[in-house]
Amino acid sequence: NKNETNVDNTITNMFKELTTNKNILFVLSANLSIEEMQNVKNLASKLNVDVSGYSPNTFDESFADDYLRTNDRTANRAAFKELQIDESKEYFDEKLNKASLVIIVENSYFENNANLLENKKVISLFSHHCMTIGYSNVAIPVASFYEKSGTYININGIKQKVISKMNKNNPMQSITTVIEDLKSMIEKGTV
């Protein structure tokens, strides 16, 4: 399948970038599942690199109402706290300043802040076409929210498991699969 070959080649290119860059920052979306966040965090730990959840653009004061009771437009921000992923501006600024490679995982912050990525290599993982892909050195398409399963923490702190019943023949890989493939390559030291 041509799509699988292209994705495999893209993952190989990402592996090469991960093994040749020392100062790496993963920037995660607060819409990822706990499993996706944990897998990225495990890979980052193996590589001894940094992970940030900074995403101030996902807050909207006009979004809250009597039912939602929050201005946070994300599905899983509480997972950052549970997994001890720093989402502060100070941490993000410090780590981004040092980074030579930035890996953006479904985080839309750079859509209007592309200038922050100048002189850096960029790898992006997105389920949809966006401006960030346009200035990425490597862009990996991943399954959308409706095509994947995972665990999310709701506004009341209750964990909810989401199970996808979408087309299982879809060639799009989940973020978890991409990250696990990369981790396996790194452990083996080869593509």
What is each residue range found by the language model?
Residues 1-23, 30, 34-191:
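Non-catalytic alpha/beta scaffold blocks inside enzyme catalytic domains
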